[in-house]
């Protein structure tokens, strides 16, 4: 059934309520839209544009918060506007459903994590439905369901066959609370787990990795293609990839014929200033090169460093510590003997695990050398300066070489190339690119994740599970509380299998995948959600992708967004895709913040219910003054706002309007109950405006054919109405493109409603029909329920959300008269109304004949008259 004038959801003139009752109205239209399958995705017709609007799908916690609301409402407005513009729109939703929160909740509540997750999904779907989102729920996906993670496993095997998935022993970040491995990106700047907050430990385990580093150059270079992404996100990814162009330098170890320490440097021009070499404490050469008299201190230092995370070791504000190992190396540039140290700031997993120390030209090396009284040798001076080094600083910029033998007098840029080439001839240097990016560690030692489809055989090694045996499903009856390893390892009936290759006894892989594996391709599945033969069809993907508009938080700039780009490129190389990038445009919405009351002396947050005077808040415990701040909403800060409570009181349309109006989408939004009330009052005013038209027995205003208004036959008031209508159409249309200024679009709707409120009832039927039709259609993406109600109440045929987006008429914007500013000596002294098509000569005559000129010129002719047609006349007295 198609929604129409006779639809059961439509209130007739007799039974329509006389006041705005959003709850009943919204429930009625949500039910009707679901019955009509209004938002089902239709394949694009020939010549029709396909538009894919997508929000980053949520973890199903069971509770919708205001951050969710902002994300999904923003995407919904974009999807609705594009649908009205004639595009075929794909706007799906799913659930990022694996992960530690569900497993931890299951342990705490003694419930199966699958049951827990499915229950949460249903709760959140019901909450989302109340927002009136134009989502095609027939394409819904949940990453924890076997019909989805079957294809995650299949894609893993594709990557494995490409050589992009591999296993190796590695020192990894271990979360002692969640008992699992973390990728580098999941450890914060304080060395804590991104989820549990525990201090991360270092542990040596055999782990699965993906070779994302194979795509480092492509991931970096193709950032230039992403013109529709925020510059901040592109910069964050570029910095994370961290491409450095330089050289590898070999330092031969004294008295160890075969031992060579290789370092990477971008400053080969400083090579003659190297006064020591530093190894990572974990570097394999440390054990063989350490002198006997230094073994005890080296061992103690290594134990100390082992307790620190990588971020702690490299933090700029932390003193750098080290110990000498009792061995020396030879500087290949000048043959000088230099000591070998180990230090906490050098990481085994980054670069070669060794660095050269140039104290005179690196701030970190300078501080380290000063701490341990190591030599400081200057080999670069700034152009045009004397050879002088301040005691308290290093010169880190380029300059002219000195104390560098044959390279003295060369510029840094020239010397970098010359020294590298010289070393390459002699066999101790070679050009090199290095990256900060590390391969993606995907192993997790937890139950609630996608099983890795590999079987380990003593004879055959790591054997892929055959594709026809997928999915490898998660077993039931697993002890989730086991510590120190994967819970799956404890279930022998699941672990012990036959090798698919040789038939001998073998064991399943018991690690599960990082949840980002599942979210790195879900946008592809939405394009072909019911395919049982493959993860997706390339033609279906090409029809919809890249995603034209992706919406999500800035916190995913490196993790999810980088991994998704990697997946897309790897699958393209595999021949499974034809696209180069997954997301054409990206909008990173700001946080939703609520007011907090904090005791600055104790750090304690006080609930608003405990604050007796909001104007002078005091802590009820110690009576001290409280700080009043706006911070990200959270339970611990007592500043959360329940979306359900807002909808129960004001309706979803008001919640949507507030979220969109309060701040530009990329900025943080400060919650304000008064502004929510203000949006509710605005919608009530719109209700009264539409009622004022209907009260004149015009409930078929949008149903009966009406000739469009013609400019020549319009009254001045009707001309003003048309100008206001078409000004709003132009402005709102512009605001719903590019940077999406929803707040200014709603401001335009407010202006239009103010103009129409007094003038519309007296206008002709044609002007009324045009104005009301445009107003309702412009409102539809923002307040979809109320717009639908208005549309049908005035006799509109079919849903307003199927109507074409209004187009502005440039002719309607042309005014018959304009207000001309009169200036005297450059200062505004008044205005006059003149015909819009006046010549400069006529404007001058009218200005001189005006009361303004008579008053300020005192009857004297001006020395000069400056005319700016349509804007102003400036009179310069004689």
From Swiss-Prot:
SUPFAM superfamilies: Anticodon-binding domain of a subclass of class I aminoacyl-tRNA synthetases, Nucleotidylyl transferase, ValRS/IleRS/LeuRS editing domain. One of its GO terms (biological process) is leucyl-tRNA aminoacylation. It is an enzyme of class 6 (ligase). One of its GO terms (cellular component) is cytosol. Residues 1-14 have a biased composition (Low complexity). A motif ('KMSKS' region) lies at residues 632-636. Coiled coil: none annotated. It is found in: Cytoplasm. A motif ('HIGH' region) lies at residues 58-68. The keyword S-adenosyl-L-methionine does not apply. GO terms for molecular function: aminoacyl-tRNA deacylase activity; ATP binding; leucine-tRNA ligase activity. It catalyses: tRNA(Leu) + L-leucine + ATP = L-leucyl-tRNA(Leu) + AMP + diphosphate. Keywords: Aminoacyl-tRNA synthetase, ATP-binding, Cytoplasm, Ligase, Nucleotide-binding, Protein biosynthesis. It comes from the Bacteria. Residues 1-23 are annotated as: Disordered. Its EC number is 6.1.1.4. Transmembrane segments: none annotated. InterPro entries: aa-tRNA-synth_I_CS, aa-tRNA-synth_Ia, Leu-tRNA-ligase, Leu_tRNA-synth_edit, M/V/L/I-tRNA-synth_anticd-bd, Methionyl/Leucyl_tRNA_Synth, Rossmann-like_a/b/a_fold, tRNAsynth_Ia_anticodon-bd. ATP binds at residue 635. PANTHER family: LEUCINE--TRNA LIGASE, MITOCHONDRIAL (PTHR43740:SF2), LEUCYL-TRNA SYNTHETASE (PTHR43740). Belongs to the class-I aminoacyl-tRNA synthetase family. This is Leucine--tRNA ligase.
């Amino acid at each position: 059934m198609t929604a129409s004038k006779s639809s059961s959801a439509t209130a007739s003139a007799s039974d329509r309520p006389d006041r705005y009752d959003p709850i009943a109205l919204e429930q009625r239209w949500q039910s009707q839209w679901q019955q009509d399958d209004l938002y089902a995705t239709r394949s694009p017709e020939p010549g029709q544009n396909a538009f894919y609007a997508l929000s980053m799908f949520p973890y199903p916690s069971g509770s919708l918060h205001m951050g969710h609301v902002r994300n999904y409402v923003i995407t919904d407005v974009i999807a609705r506007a594009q649908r009205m513009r004639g595009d075929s729109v794909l706007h799906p939703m799913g659930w990022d459903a694996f992960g530690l929160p569900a497993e931890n909740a299951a342990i705490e509540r003694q419930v199966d994590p699958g049951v827990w997750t499915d229950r949460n999904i249903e709760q959140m779907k019901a909450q989302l439905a109340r927002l009136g989102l134009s989502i095609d729920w027939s394409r819904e996906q949940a990453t924890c369901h076997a019909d989805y993670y079957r294809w995650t496993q299949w894609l893993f095997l594709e990557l494995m066959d490409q050589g992009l998935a591999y296993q190796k022993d590695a020192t990894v970040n271990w979360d002692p609370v969640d008992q699992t491995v973390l990728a580098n990106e999941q450890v914060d700047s304080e060395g804590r787990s991104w989820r549990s907050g525990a201090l991360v430990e270092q542990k040596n385990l055999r782990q699965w990795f993906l070779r994302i580093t194979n795509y480092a150059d492509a991931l970096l270079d193709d950032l230039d293609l992403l013109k529709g992404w925020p510059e901040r996100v592109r910069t964050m990814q570029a910095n994370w990839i961290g491409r450095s162009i330089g050289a590898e330098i070999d330092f031969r170890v004294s008295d160890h014929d075969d031992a060579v320490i290789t370092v990477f440097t971008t400053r080969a021009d400083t090579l003659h200033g190297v006064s020591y070499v530093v190894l990572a404490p974990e570097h394999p050469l440390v054990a063989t090169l350490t002198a006997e008299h230094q073994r005890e201190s080296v061992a103690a230092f290594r134990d100390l460093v082992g307790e620190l995370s990588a971020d702690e070791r490299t933090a700029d504000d932390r003193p750098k510590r080290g110990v000498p190992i009792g061995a020396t190396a030879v500087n290949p540039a000048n043959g000088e003997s230099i000591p070998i140290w180990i230090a906490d700031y050098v990481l085994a997993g980054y670069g070669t695990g060794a660095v050269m120390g140039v104290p005179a030209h690196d701030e970190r090396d300078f501080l380290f050398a000063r701490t341990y009284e190591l030599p400081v040798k200057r080999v670069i001076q700034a152009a045009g300066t004397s050879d002088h080094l301040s005691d308290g600083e290093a010169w880190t910029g380029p300059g002219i070489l000195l104390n560098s033998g044959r390279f003295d007098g060369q510029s840094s840029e020239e010397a970098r190339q010359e020294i590298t080439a010289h070393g390459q001839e002699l066999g101790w240097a070679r050009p090199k690119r290095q990256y900060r990016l590390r391969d993606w560690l995907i192993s997790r030692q937890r139950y609630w994740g996608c099983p890795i489809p590999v079987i380990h055989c003593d004879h055959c090694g790591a054997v892929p599970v055959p594709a026809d045996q997928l999915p490898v499903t998660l077993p039931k009856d697993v002890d989730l509380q086991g510590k120190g390893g994967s819970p799956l390892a404890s279930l022998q009936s699941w672990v012990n299998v036959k090798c698919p290759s040789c038939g001998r006894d073998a064991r399943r892989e018991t690690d599960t995948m990082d949840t980002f594996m599942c979210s790195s391709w879900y946008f592809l599945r939405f394009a072909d959600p019911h395919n049982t033969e493959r993860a997706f069809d390339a033609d279906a993907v090409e029809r919809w992708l890249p995603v034209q508009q992706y919406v999500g938080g800035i916190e995913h700039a490196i993790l999810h967004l980088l991994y998704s780009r990697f997946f897309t490129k790897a699958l393209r190389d595999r021949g499974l895709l034809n696209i180069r990038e997954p997301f054409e445009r990206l909008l990173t919405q700001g946080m939703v913040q609520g007011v907090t009351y904090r005791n600055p002396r104790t750090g304690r947050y006080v609930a608003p219910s405990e604050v007796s005077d909001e104007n002078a808040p005091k802590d009820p415990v110690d009576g001290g003054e409280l700080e009043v701040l706006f911070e990200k909403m959270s339970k611990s800060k007592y500043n959360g706002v329940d979306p359900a409570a807002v909808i129960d009181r004001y309706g979803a349309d008001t919640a949507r309007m507030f979220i969109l109006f309060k701040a530009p989408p990329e900025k943080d939004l400060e919650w304000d109950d008064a502004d929510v009330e203000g949006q509710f009052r605005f919608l009530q005013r719109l209700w009264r405006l539409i009622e004022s038209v209907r009260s004149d027995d015009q409930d078929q205003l949008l149903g009966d054919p009406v000739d469009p208004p013609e400019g020549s036959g319009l009254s001045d008031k009707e001309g003003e109405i048309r100008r206001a209508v078409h000004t709003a159409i132009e402005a709102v249309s512009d605001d719903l493109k590019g940077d999406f200024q929803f707040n200014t679009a709603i401001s335009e709707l407010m202006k239009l409603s103010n103009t129409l409120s007094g003038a519309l009832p007296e206008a002709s039927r044609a002007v009324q029909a045009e104005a009301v039709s445009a107003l309702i259609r412009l409102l539809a993406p923002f307040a979809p329920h109320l717009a639908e109600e208005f549309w049908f109440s005035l006799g509109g045929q079919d849903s307003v959300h199927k109507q074409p987006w209004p187009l502005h008429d440039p002719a309607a914007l042309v005014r018959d008269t304009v207000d001309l500013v009169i200036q005297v000596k450059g200062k505004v002294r008044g205005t006059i109304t003149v015909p819009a098509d006046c010549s400069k000569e006529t404007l001058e005559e009218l200005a001189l004949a005006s009361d303004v000129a008579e008053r300020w010129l005192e009857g004297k002719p001006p020395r000069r008259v400056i005319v700016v047609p349509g804007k102003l006349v400036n009179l310069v007295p004689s």
